[in-house]
A protein has these predicted regions:
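Short, flexible helix-loop junctions that flank or precede catalytic/ligand sites
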Residues: 1-172
């Protein structure tokens, strides 16, 4: 069974919708965009309560998504938020649509960071995930960097060099 709450029709705000979802014991909670501190805070609470929370953030890559969540909170709470994230965050997927060289439809670029038990405890509360997924061990776990995807698309002549430079995260 699917129960959907539409903001403006079924709920006044994301916050009100999330509070109602928590009271109704939903298994999965989908948030189209986490735009304020209250929504982010409730999403973390829902994840801590065992709900699968899927949320969208307007960021350029997976690491930026994590940073945006942490930076929503005041400085004095950021250490605690990093700790909470390290306990509940299963992974982050960031997507971008890149223009194809042939002028056809766009193609997808992804940045994937998956947590595992070794990554989940931040060192002194500073990092939830490693900054890069170029490390071969991380790639074996299913992590994918946007730069690697962009490079592969360029090498396969799907995108041109200007597009590759534009979408590369760490430069060329």
């Amino acid at each position: 069974m699917v129960l959907q709450r539409e903001i403006g029709i079924d709920s006044r705000s994301y916050e009100a919708g999330l509070k109602a979802a928590l009271k109704q014991d939903m298994d999965v909670i989908l948030i189209s965009e986490m735009e304020d501190l209250d929504t982010v805070s409730l999403a973390l609470t829902a994840a801590e309560m065992g709900h699968l929370v899927i949320a969208a953030l307007p960021t350029q890559n997976a690491v930026a998504s994590i940073e945006r969540i942490v930076e929503c909170f005041p400085d004095h709470r950021q250490h605690q938020i990093r700790s909470q994230l390290s306990d509940v965050l299963a992974g982050v997927i960031s997507q971008q649509l890149l223009p194809r060289m042939d002028g056809g439809r766009t193609c997808g670029g992804v940045d994937v960071l998956l947590a595992n038990q070794g990554d989940k405890k931040p060192d002194k509360g500073t990092e939830v995930f490693p900054d890069t997924v170029r490390d071969a061990q991380l790639q074996k776990r299913g992590n994918v960097s946007m730069d690697d995807v962009v490079y592969d698309l360029y090498m396969k002549s799907v995108i041109d060099s200007d597009t590759a430079v534009c979408y590369a995260q760490d430069g060329v």
